[in-house]
Amino acid sequence: MTVLHSVDFFPSGNASVAIEPRLPQADFPEHHHDFHEIVIVEHGTGIHVFNGQPYTITGGTVCFVRDHDRHLYEHTDNLCLTNVLYRSPDRFQFLAGLNQLLPQELDGQYPSHWRVNHSVLQQVRQLVAQMEQQEGENDLPSTASREILFMQLLLLLRKSSLQENLENSASRLNLLLAWLEDHFADEVNWDAVAEQFSLSLRTLHRQLKQQTGVTPQRYLNRLRLMKARHLLRHSEASVTDIAYRCGFSDSNHFSTLFRREFNWSPRDIRQGRDGFLQ
């Protein structure tokens, strides 16, 4: 597995924060690093496989990656990221207690993926731009300023994620996308879903396509297929059982969609013919 080292990314040995844009981010194999990072998805779509679990990411997704996590990007489509790198929560010169603002693992569950709306994403970009402007400065005031900006970024992300509400359609769409991650195997009636999230059906279709690049049903199918591929690689369940568990009522239809999406059959994936290393 590829290991990325801080010496290749941080501008100096005493720098606590670094900005690493990926515009765009191509498919990238599984790796980990000796530093932490906050991945901010600017726009585009892709699959982020985080510690073996697949997540669909789009503009407004924020991922918190620790130094012992492993992850990869695949199935990317104009995926543009900004990575905010930091050595460790306790490696700041002027800040303490940052770990309390970061996602906390509870009972083995780590909430690594958050979502923010478009207006928050704009504020995030402004903070990141200010950090970038000061990257070449190593004096104490500049170091303190960068660390304060990093603290502001964490506060903004935490507050925005905790207070995601139904005030506007963009926030409601974010909640809908999070709901789909948890209910991908359910029978989805888009009229009922639109009503549940106080969106008109037309608005749901338009905004979801703007956000993900595909229609709602195509997005749902892709989500189901990603979950199915994960189960094919990491479980002993039959192809038919996996199809049903991921929301497909017809295993033949599932196999057709699967091959169309990945250019491999479910059996190929089960046998490791796609070259994936378990």
UniProtKB/Swiss-Prot annotation:
Keyword Iron-sulfur annotated: no
Signal peptide: none
Feature: DNA-binding region: 191-212, 239-262
Compartmental location: Cytoplasm
PROSITE patterns: HTH_ARAC_FAMILY_1, HTH_ARAC_FAMILY_2
Coiled-coil ranges (or none): none
Gene Ontology BP term (one): rhamnose metabolic process
Record-linked Pfam families: AraC_binding, HTH_18
Keywords of the record: Activator, Cytoplasm, DNA-binding, Repeat, Rhamnose metabolism, Transcription, Transcription regulation
Molecular-function annotations in GO: DNA-binding transcription factor activity; sequence-specific DNA binding
Subunit text: Binds DNA as a dimer.
Free-text function comment from the UniProt entry: Activates expression of the rhaBAD and rhaT operons.
Protein's UniProt name: HTH-type transcriptional activator RhaS
Source organism (scientific name): Escherichia coli O139:H28 (strain E24377A / ETEC)
Gene expressing this chain: rhaS
